[in-house]
């Protein structure tokens, strides 16, 4: 069982014995969290996570592409701002602020940003590949 300590990063060892983060801080202040590149014209900010869930803010410049890909995680995304052409399992829809989409595990999905904007992505389980070890 993981013991949660307010406002600290819990650490646990992975199979190799390396320390890895298992949860984020309790309070997530936007201007205190780093942004990292996630492709040309795309950057992401990891908002919060534990071993079961992760929330990530993703900003896109107009014309930026979230290349079609798959992952074993379930994903739900919310369009905070902008306009996006979203493809999932061969279906394409244009989504704007207030819209969202669900991606089942292993479904091929991607986006093209038609107007600069932000997506809020939620994954389960967490995307450990997004965490710096």
Please give the residue ranges for each predicted region.
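A short, N-terminal "cap"/entry segment at the start of jelly-roll beta-barrel domains
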Residues: 1-52, 132
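Conserved short histidine dyad/triad with adjacent acidic residue
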Residues: 39, 56-70
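Short, conserved beta-strand element in jelly-roll/cupin
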Residues: 59-60, 70-86
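Histidine-centered metal-chelating micro-motifs
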Residues: 65-66, 85, 101, 105-110
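Structural motif
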Residues: 76, 83-85, 92, 108, ...
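A cytosolic small-molecule/anion-sensing beta-strand core signal
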Residues: 80-81, 96-97, 115
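Short acidic-glycine-tyrosine-enriched beta hairpin
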Residues: 90-105
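Ligand-binding loop in jelly-roll beta-barrel domains
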Residues: 105-129
């Amino acid at each position: 069982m993981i013991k949660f300590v307010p406002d600290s990063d819990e650490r646990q060892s992975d199979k190799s014995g390396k320390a890895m983060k298992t949860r984020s801080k309790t309070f997530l202040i936007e201007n205190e969290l780093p942004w990292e590149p996630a492709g040309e014209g795309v950057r992401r900010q990891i908002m919060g996570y534990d071993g079961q869930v992760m929330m990530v803010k993703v900003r896109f410049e107009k014309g930026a592409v979230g290349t079609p890909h798959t992952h074993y995680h379930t994903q739900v995304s919310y369009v905070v701002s902008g306009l996006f052409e979203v493809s999932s399992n061969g279906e394409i829809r244009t989504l704007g602020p207030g819209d969202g989409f669900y991606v089942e595990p292993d479904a091929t999905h991607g986006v093209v940003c038609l107007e600069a904007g932000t997506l809020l992505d939620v994954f389960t389980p967490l995307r450990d590949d997004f965490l710096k070890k």
